[in-house]
Structure formats: structure tokens, C-alpha cells
Swiss-Prot record:
Organism: Synechococcus sp. (strain JA-3-3Ab) (Cyanobacteria bacterium Yellowstone A-Prime)
GO terms (BP aspect): mismatch repair
Bias (Polar residues) ranges: 836-845
Protein name per its UniProtKB record: DNA mismatch repair protein MutS
Source domain of life: Bacteria
Residue span of region Disordered: 833-867
Entry-linked Pfam families: MutS_I, MutS_II, MutS_III, MutS_IV, MutS_V
Purpose of the protein: This protein is involved in the repair of mismatches in DNA. It is possible that it carries out the mismatch recognition step. This protein has a weak ATPase activity.
Length: 882
């Protein structure tokens, strides 16, 4: 576009827009943020706002769309939620003081990952900005990941191998935005979710921002980290030997510098004003839960509706603050593997559990705290509004009370609240003594500062008070002086205060009255004295507002300089709150403290499903036990039982109890001894994944392959009806082979729920497999679900019975029964089973024979002599063909 065709202001706009081509540019003009050209069209469409126009010079009228500045947060939230980035251009000087064109600059770029506005954030969920650097080798991708939440200060780095592991970390974090160094052939810019050009090999559901490669280079990134945190080496951060992690972190910091110009100013204390120094972690520090497992076990949302209600987190989260809620969610998605850390959390829960009075009082104190973690960053970034500062002050003011409350505490976490940083208490007091308790949300209209704080402010206010009083009295004095009883003092926007007199009496007014307006029944006058007072009030009011604003900003800066210390207590409080919530659940739901061991045992006595138990009337849930992990029990349990009997519930409850234990929580069981797991795998139900072009069965097999390839002795594997999605014989064969492989090769602790009753034969063949069944009571005309798990295998599924209960038409039920009888009598599988019964004399116990023949570990190799035994099955299944 030829600049000569544009007014100077529009030239400036176009110039800025060129610098931020991937963001919507919001250009401040007076009380509005205006957008022009395509941005205007886009925003008017997305937000359903009126598209207007503006004269832009010789070019004529151009499209324009505006939002009032005071509604900025609301509209910005909508745009960011849709995955857009916003470049906010503010006026850097008051329009009336500008010589020529008002100076305007882009002060902030808001992108989905760099949001700090309360309206744009979810209270109980982190909002992560991630950065990834990948090195794609011939065999394996090596990657570095950095992620941060600029609303709370969290900052982590990690380096790992394997595309899948990276995707799982992303699935855990659900980053709002992912930064990548641009690669050859790709440009710069932002890709909204679902963009068909999503970066090679990465999931399409995220927002990606492609960045220049330079800040992601090792030397640059390292220098950036060292500089930012005032360090001489990265040794202390633990990432010295992790070049890809460093590169990702450097790219992330650089992005913040560039987009958050006004927020990210060097902090006087050194360090980053918004992010604490990055912490390094490894995937193996934590219990690994893959995406399927998080989904299948419904940790944070239900499978069917994606709802929070009905998830494990719904049962667990009794924390009182949003920061406690966020912490709990993080713990749930990233359970521990370090027994010492688990014990620390358990200790705190136990202390709270054993002291109801401590718990009650702690609960009400926590209730009165605000989200200190986010408030810390609101003050650090200089964006906190008066109400937020008041919330900060009142929360800090509670710290001494908290310290007193935990004075006798025995566990380290609670003890760490005993020492209160006096600077924070001071700050809290100063905020409380400076700010009025319920100030308006805006900064520039006064009403913020208490009397007695500032002498000048008090003087101005007093003067305004006197002048107002004088005006209030004026009606009375002027009535007396003029002898006009109907004289009134009025006010309107157009010309301020005036004296109103009915037209009939207009002749009686004193001569110093100046006529301003004549209405039908009334004449309006002013006097020089009145105008003088009025002007004085107006100037004083402006001065007051200005003074209050200054005092407020000063106080906010003071608070900002303590951000790191606030963040630190906030973190402790968040952890205390999360554990407080877990203690509450433990009390209300009768959870017990599990014993954590280093071996492979998984012993649960009278365990319950935390969510199902909550949704049933009290006492109706039937507890069940389990022993897994040789030598404490079998390694693999084949679980059979009728439809609707409770197999899936049992299987999931074991996984949930293990996860609860490793996140440090108590568990719904009478007693539990649990060896630490490295991973929990699940394969449950059939979910179509049409989006990725995979069939139901293909998804099932993919997930199964993943389990067989990655599970180990330390893993817990939960398989629900493997092989169901294909022809019966294929499915049965696969189920058999998978179970056998898990028991003999992987030796993972496994629960294998199935309707293939043939699998019960594995118990007789393999020493570390046992059969369990969920029993029902069969009456003459119906069955009763007992939901009890017992040793032994079931031989019927009562599927037709369940169909009847579900309301299948009677003729269909009758016909199904006929077909079933025929099938059982004549099918090859039926024949096979019956002939197998004959061919196996009861005296010849195959389990004994198997043990003699197998190798010294008692576990056969797949191709070992045990094959003789395994051949039993194919011959019996396909008797006619062989
Ligand atoms: N231990 C229990 N105590 C009380 N109710 C239970 C218990 N276990 C399961 N139930 C109830 O039974 C219902 C069915 O359980 P579940 O889905 O586990 O059965 P299933 O054996 O897996 O059935 P299917 O073979 O059809 O998949 C649950 O929704 C729950 O309401
Ligand atoms: Mg089931």
C-alpha cells in the first residue's frame, strides 16, 4: 500500500501491523481499541460487532471495527479462546499533551499461552506455554521441552526420547500454546488448532507458534538463561547436560521478552519477574500415565461426556483455594515414584486427619485466602487492579494466624508455615492500611486510598468537602438573601452547577446573577463565586484521582518487588490446601493410608471404586480385594463374570487406588500394601477414533501393541475385553496370546477382564496366572448381581439376561435363547470345548506337568516346551480342521 495515500496516523498503523503480521492489532484511539482492514473484518465476524469505516486519507474510507477500552478483557478473552493472538497498541501520552501525532506503542502481545487476565484463565487449571526443540534422528526423535505458566511462575524443563513420550507430556499439560523454532520451508506465525499445516508429526489440537530459530540455538539460549537468572552455570538448574531442554527454555524466555514488553521488565532483585528459575525433571521421576490411561480411568473428566462431575478429580478436590485445586490436578496427572516424597504427603494428611480441630480451623483460614500464586504474578507484572491488591493484602494478613494455628504441627510441610516472612506481613498491613476495603476495579477514578495515608490527599479531599458543603448551603443562603423561596441549586453535565428560579420570579434576581439558559418555566443562572468553587472542585478532584493513582501504583510496585517471596508461600499454601482436601476426603469417605513398598506387591483388602462408591447410596458398594505380583500373588488375573457384574469397575478401581497411592493420597480400602509402579497401562472399551482415520479395532490393537512394547515388571496393566472388536476366533486368539505374553515375557502385574471363558485355562498352564470371577446369584427367572470377586472362572456371561433387563423385545430374547442353545451344541468352538474335556483325564493335572517341563524360573519362554501344552487349545478349538 502506498503510504502517500494514508493519513500519518494510518501510516503508523500500517507500519505497526507489518511488525505484527500474525496478530490482530488493537490500536488505541481515545476510548476505543480500533481495528482496520482485514483485522476489522475478521473481528466483526468473530465477535459479531458492527463493521464501520474511517477516512484514511487519499485512499478513502477503510473498514474499521472497535471495542470500548473498558470492555477489552471480555472481548480479548473471546478472541484468545478462539486461538488468535492480539497485539495491543496503547497511547503512551495523553492526547491533549501530544505534539502532533500521539505516541503509540505495542505494549503487549496476548497469545493463548501468555494470558494473565483473570477473565481469560481457568481458576483451577494451569495455563501453559510450552516450547519444543526436536532432533529427528534415523531411529528416534530426541526432544527438549520447556513449559511455563506465566500466571503462576511455574517453569519446567525436560529432555526425552521418542515422539510418543513427547505427545504424552503434551497431553498431560494441555498447553495453550506451543512454540517451535521454524524449520526450513515453514514460515513464522501462529497456527490455530486444527490448522491443516500443523507442524510435522505433532498433534493438531494445539495452537502452535513458529518462531525464528536463532533464540533456540544452544549458545543463545544458554546465554539467555544465564543472563536472566544471573547465573554463571546451569549446573544448579540441573539441565547443564541437556542441550535440547536448554534450547527450548531459551526460546520460551525470548518469546516472553518479545511479546510481554511491559510485563517483563528486569526485576530489581534479579531473576525473571514472572518465572521462577526452571526446574529440570525426567519422565521417569514420575509414574507415567499415557493418554489412554488418563482418559480410560477418567482422572479429570468422564469418557462419555468429557464432564468434570464423575471424574476422580471431582471426588478428590476438596481444596478451598484455586491454587490448591491446580496443585491437586497436577499431582493427579503426575503421580510420584519417590517413596520419600509420597511418605511426606501421607504424613501431612495423617496429621490433619488425626486432628479434627486443626482441620476445621485450617479449612476456614484457607477459605479466606485468595489465589496468592496468581496475585503474585499480577503484582509482579504491574497489572493487579485495586481489588486484587486488597485481596493480596488480606491474604498476607492471614499468615500470622496460620503460623499460630500450625505452631504445634509435627509434619515438615505444616511446620514450614510456622515461620512467616516479616516483610510479607508488613506488606499485608501496609496494603490493608492504605487501600479502602472495597475499591472500584478501575484505577483512575479515585476511591482507592484510605484517609490519613497521605497529607496532600487529605488536604485536597477536605477542600473538596468544604466546597461541596458551601454549594449545598447555597440554596438556603440565596433563598434568604433574594427572598425567592423556590430558588434551587441544580447540576447538569453541560454547564455544571446553576441556580434555578421560576420564570415568574426571574425579575427579582440580584444583578450579579448571570443568565445561562431559559426553559419554559424556569430560568437558570450562575454566579462567578459558584463557578469558582465548581472549578476548584473539578481541579481538586483531578488532582485527587491522580494522587490516588500514584499512591496505588507505588504500593503495587512495592508488592511486586516481593513477588518471589509471595510465590514461595503461595506454593506451600497450595500444597497444604491440596493435602487438606485429601484429608477431608479421607475422613468423609473412610480412606486409609497405604503402605508403599519397593517390591512388586499389590495387595488391596476390601478396596472400593472411589467414584462409583460415591454415586451409589452409602453402603451399597461391595468392596473387593486383590493380591497381585509374585511372590505375593499371581502376576496375571483372568477376570471373568457376567455382563454388568462389575468386572470393569473392579479393574479400574485397582488402577485408581494405585494412582491415588502414588500421588500421596489415602485410598478407598480397608488396607493396602502397594509396590511402586513405573507405569499404569489401560486398554478399556472401544472408542472410535474416526478423526485419525483408524477403525475401532485398529485403535484397540495400536493401544495393545503399545502396552506389550512398553510395559515391564514394574508396570500395572489393566486390560478390559481385549480382542472384542473382531471375529470371535481372531479375538479369542489374540486375547490368549496377549495374556500369555504378558504373564511370561513382560511379567507385568495384569488384570485381564474378558468374556472369553476359554482363557480360564491359562491358569492351569502358567504358574503366575490365576482366575477370578465376579459372581451373581441365579434365581429361577432372573439373576442378582452380587458384585463379589472370588477365585475361580465364570462359564457364562448372561448376556441375554442383560439384554432382557435393557428392554430388548421379548421375541428377540426368546430367539436369542434358541440360537444360544444351538450354538452351544453345534458350533465348532462348543464342540472343541466338549472334546477337550474328554481328552484331558482329570488325574493328569496339566499344571503339574507344565511346571516340570518349564525352565527354572517357572516361566516358560514362548517357544519352550510349554508349547506342547499350548497346542491343546488350537487342537481343541478347531477339531474338524486338524
Ligand atoms: N463392587 C460393586 N458394588 C456395587 N455396585 C457395583 C460394583 N461393581 C459394579 N457395580 C455396578 O454395576 C455396574 C456395572 O459394572 P461394570 O461395568 O463393572 O460391569 P462389567 O462386568 O464390566 O460389565 P460388562 O461385561 O457388560 O462390561 C456399575 O455401573 C455399578 O453400578
Ligand atoms: Mg465391562
Amino acid at each position: 500500500m502506498d503510504p502517500a495515500l494514508l493519513t500519518p496516523m494510518m501510516q503508523h498503523y500500517v507500519e505497526l501491523k507489518r511488525q505484527y503480521p500474525h496478530a490482530i492489532l488493537l490500536y488505541r484511539l481515545g476510548d476505543f481499541y480500533e481495528m482496520f482492514f482485514q483485522d476489522a473484518q475478521l473481528v466483526s465476524r468473530e465477535l459479531e460487532l458492527v463493521l464501520t469505516g474511517r477516512e484514511a486519507g487519499a485512499i478513502g474510507r477503510v473498514p474499521m471495527c472497535g471495542i470500548p477500552y473498558h470492555a477489552f478483557d471480555r472481548y480479548a478473552a473471546q478472541l484468545v479462546a478462539k486461538g488468535y493472538a492480539l497485539a495491543v497498541c496503547d497511547q503512551m501520552e495523553p492526547a491533549d499533551q501530544a505534539k502532533g501525532l500521539v505516541r503509540r506503542e505495542v505494549t503487549r502481545v496476548i497469545t493463548p499461552g501468555t494470558v494473565i487476565e483473570e477473565e481469560l484463565l481457568q481458576a483451577r487449571q494451569n495455563n501453559y506455554l510450552a516450547a519444543i526443540v526436536r532432533l529427528r534422528g534415523s531411529k528416534q526423535t530426541v526432544w527438549g521441552l520447556a513449559y511455563a505458566d506465566i500466571s503462576t511462575g511455574e517453569f519446567w524443563v525436560c529432555q526425552g526420547e521418542g515422539q510418543e513420550q513427547l505427545e504424552q507430556e503434551l497431553a498431560r499439560l494441555q498447553p495453550a500454546e506451543i512454540l517451535l523454532p521454524t524449520e526450513e520451508g515453514l514460515g513464522l506465525g501462529l497456527m490455530r488448532p486444527g490448522d491443516p499445516q500443523a507442524p510435522l508429526g505433532l498433534p493438531g489440537q494445539y495452537t502452535y507458534t513458529l518462531r525464528p530459530a536463532e533464540p533456540f540455538e544452544l549458545a543463545t539460549a544458554r546465554e539467555n538463561l544465564l543472563q536472566t537468572y544471573g547465573l554463571r552455570s546451569l549446573e544448579g538448574l540441573g539441565c547443564e547436560g541437556l542441550p535440547l531442554a536448554i534450547r527450548a527454555a531459551g526460546g520460551l524466555l525470548h518469546y516472553l521478552e518479545e511479546t510481554q514488553k511491559n510485563l517483563v521488565q528486569p526485576s530489581p532483585q534479579g531473576g525473571h519477574p514472572l518465572l521462577r528459575p526452571p526446574r529440570t525433571y525426567q519422565l521417569t521421576d514420575y509414574l507415567i500415565l499415557d493418554t489412554q490411561t488418563r482418559r480410560n480411568l477418567e482422572l479429570t473428566q468422564t469418557i462419555r461426556e468429557g464432564a468434570f462431575v464423575g471424574s476422580l478429580l471431582w471426588v478428590l478436590d476438596r481444596s478451598r483455594t484455586a491454587m490448591g485445586g491446580r496443585t491437586l490436578r497436577r499431582w493427579l496427572l503426575q503421580p510420584l515414584r519417590d517413596p520419600e516424597q509420597i511418605r511426606l504427603r501421607q504424613d501431612t494428611i495423617q496429621e490433619l486427619l488425626e486432628s479434627p480441630s486443626l482441620r476445621t480451623r485450617l479449612g476456614s483460614l484457607l477459605d479466606s485466602l485468595y489465589d496468592l500464586e496468581r496475585l503474585a504474578n499480577r503484582v509482579a507484572s504491574g497489572t493487579a487492579n485495586p481489588r486484587e491488591l486488597v485481596a493480596l493484602g488480606s491474604s498476607l494478613g492471614k499468615l500470622p494466624q496460620l503460623a499460630e494455628l500450625v505452631a504445634e504441627a509435627q509434619t515438615p510441610l505444616l511446620q514450614s508455615l510456622q515461620q512467616v516472612d516479616p516483610a510479607l506481613v508488613d506488606l499485608g498491613h501496609r496494603i490493608e492500611h492504605t487501600l479502602l476495603p472495597s475499591p472500584p476495579p478501575v484505577l483512575t477514578e479515585g476511591g482507592l486510598i484510605r484517609p490519613g495515608v497521605d497529607a496532600e490527599l487529605d488536604r485536597l479531599r477536605q477542600q473538596v468537602e468544604q466546597d461541596r458543603h458551601w454549594i449545598a448551603q447555597l440554596e438556603k443562603t440565596e433563598r434568604e438573601r433574594t427572598g425567592i423561596p423556590t430558588l434551587k441549586v441544580g447540576f447538569n453535565k453541560a454547564f455544571g452547577y446553576y441556580l434555578s428560579i421560576s420564570r415568574a420570579k426571574a425579575q427579582q434576581v440580584p444583578k450579579e446573577y448571570i443568565r445561562k439558559q431559559t426553559l419554559t418555566n424556569e430560568e437558570r443562572f450562575i454566579t462567578p463565586e459558584l463557578k469558582e468553587k465548581e472549578a476548584r472542585i473539578l481541579t481538586a478532584q483531578t488532582e485527587i484521582n491522580q494522587r490516588e493513582y500514584e499512591l496505588f501504583v507505588q504500593l503495587r510496585q512495592e508488592a511486586g518487588s516481593q513477588a518471589a517471596a509471595i510465590r514461595q508461600v503461595a506454593q506451600t499454601l497450595a500444597a497444604v490446601d491440596a493435602l487438606f482436601g485429601l484429608a477431608e476426603v479421607a475422613v468423609q469417605q473412610g480412606y486409609t493410608r497405604p503402605v508403599i513398598t519397593a517390591d512388586r506387591r499389590l495387595i488391596i483388602e476390601e478396596g472400593r471404586h472411589p467414584v462409583v462408591e460415591k454415586s451409589l447410596p452409602q453402603g451399597l458398594f461391595v468392596p473387593n480385594s486383590v493380591r497381585l505380583g509374585s511372590p505375593h500373588g499371581p502376576d496375571l488375573i483372568v477376570l471373568t463374570g457376567p455382563n454388568m457384574s462389575g468386572k470393569s469397575t473392579y479393574l479400574r478401581q485397582i488402577g485408581l487406588i494405585q494412582i491415588l497411592a502414588q500421588m500421596g493420597s489415602f485410598v478407598p480400602a480397608r488396607r493396602a500394601e502397594l509396590g511402586l509402579c513405573d507405569r499404569v497401562f489401560t486398554r478399556i472399551g472401544a472408542v472410535d477414533d474416526l478423526a485419525t482415520g483408524q477403525s475401532t479395532f485398529m485403535v484397540e490393537m495400536n493401544e495393545t501393541a503399545n502396552i506389550l512394547n512398553h510395559a515391564g515388571e514394574r508396570s500395572l496393566v489393566l486390560l478390559d475385553e481385549i480382542g472384542r472388536g473382531t471375529a470371535t476366533f481372531d479375538g479369542l486368539s489374540i486375547a490368549w496370546a496377549v495374556a500369555e505374553y504378558l504373564a511370561t515375557q513382560v511379567r507385568a502385574r495384569t488384570i485381564f477382564a474378558t468374556h472369553y471363558h476359554e482363557l480360564n485355562q491359562l491358569e492351569t498352564l502358567l504358574p503366575n496366572v490365576a482366575n477370578f470371577q465376579v459372581v451373581v446369584k441365579e434365581l429361577r427367572d432372573r439373576i442378582i448381581f452380587l458384585h463379589q470377586v472370588q477365585p475361580g472362572g465364570a462359564d457364562r456371561s448372561y448376556g441375554i439376561e442383560v439384554g432382557r433387563m435393557a428392554g430388548l423385545p421379548q421375541p428377540v430374547i426368546e430367539r436369542a435363547k434358541q440360537v444360544l442353545a444351538l450354538v452351544e451344541q453345534h458350533s465348532r468352538i462348543g464342540l472343541g470345548l466338549r472334546s477337550q474335556g474328554k481328552s484331558r483325564p482329570s488325574s493328569n493335572n496339566p499344571k503339574k506337568r507344565f511346571k516340570q517341563e518349564s525352565n527354572s524360573r517357572g516361566i516358560p519362554d514362548c517357544d519352550a516346551k510349554a508349547g506342547d501344552q499350548l497346542s491343546l487349545i488350537p487342537t481343541s478349538l478347531y477339531p474338524e480342521e486338524l
